[in-house]
């Protein structure tokens, strides 16, 4: 019988068999954990380096949630959208569709990241918190090291392809556990099916959650998917 919550982090394919059987998967690296007990049920090269793609956004969210928890950031605080953030919304990447000069609340940016996987929202949040995305990436890597992600380095807030933005499925598991244990009140956002943002006060944009597992009636409640041409899903 499946436990209440299981985390499966994988590259390129879904786990094809029941966890109690002999598992054969095509993924180069994978890890499966019973969240409640902490038991690792399956792993395959868990320390192999990968490009985390949009799973990078888990750490982007964690940085913001930690600051909110400490009182150094507020959900209703607004950040002004820079040209750098806007350009990502016009470059074919997953986006929240912000415009230069928009003033967007931290809550909307976070939901734009978590639900719509907006790369533009990531940059806006990073710049609002740290001044530059580069400084924010330093904060991300520092946090990763602090919580035991010893084979991870972040160079950007969105996971856009960069050979120096890397992690492992084991480290992504550590990061995911940290998110759920320390910020349960916000974790529910990861299972929201859609996000609506009305930048003009009359022309709302509604986007569905980028996590396809949420639509499969299999009990998934998150967390994040990622795709890069070099890694696939």
Regions found by a protein language model. Give the residues of each.
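Sec-dependent N-terminal signal peptides
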Residues: 4-13
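Sterically constrained small-residue positions within well-ordered secondary structures
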Residues: 7, 21-23, 227-229
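Active-site-adjacent loops and short helices of periplasmic peptidoglycan-processing enzymes
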Residues: 17-173, 177-181
């Amino acid at each position: 019988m499946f436990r209440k919550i299981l985390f499966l982090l994988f590259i390129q394919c879904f786990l094809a068999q029941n966890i109690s059987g002999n598992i054969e998967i095509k993924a180069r690296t994978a890890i499966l954990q019973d969240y409640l007990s902490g038991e690792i049920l399956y792993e395959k090269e868990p320390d192999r380096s990968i490009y985390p793609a949009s799973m990078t956004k888990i750490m982007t969210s964690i940085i913001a949630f930690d600051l909110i928890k400490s009182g150094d950031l507020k959900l209703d605080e607004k950040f002004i959208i820079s040209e750098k953030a806007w350009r990502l919304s016009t470059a074919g990447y997953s986006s929240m569709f912000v415009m230069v000069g928009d003033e967007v609340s931290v809550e909307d940016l976070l939901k734009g990241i978590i639900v719509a996987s907006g790369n533009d929202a990531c940059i806006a949040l990073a710049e609002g918190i740290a001044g530059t995305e580069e400084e924010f990436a330093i904060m991300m890597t520092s946090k990763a090291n602090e919580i035991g992600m010893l084979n991870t380095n972040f160079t950007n807030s969105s996971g856009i392809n960069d050979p120096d933005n890397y992690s492992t499925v084991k480290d992504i598991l550590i990061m995911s556990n940290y998110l759920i244990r320390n910020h349960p009140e916000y974790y529910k956002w990861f299972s929201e099916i859609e996000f609506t943002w009305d930048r003009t006060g009359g022309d709302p944009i509604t986007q569905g959650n980028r996590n396809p597992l949420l639509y499969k009636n299999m009990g998934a409640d998150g967390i994040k998917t990622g795709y890069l041409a070099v890694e696939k899903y």
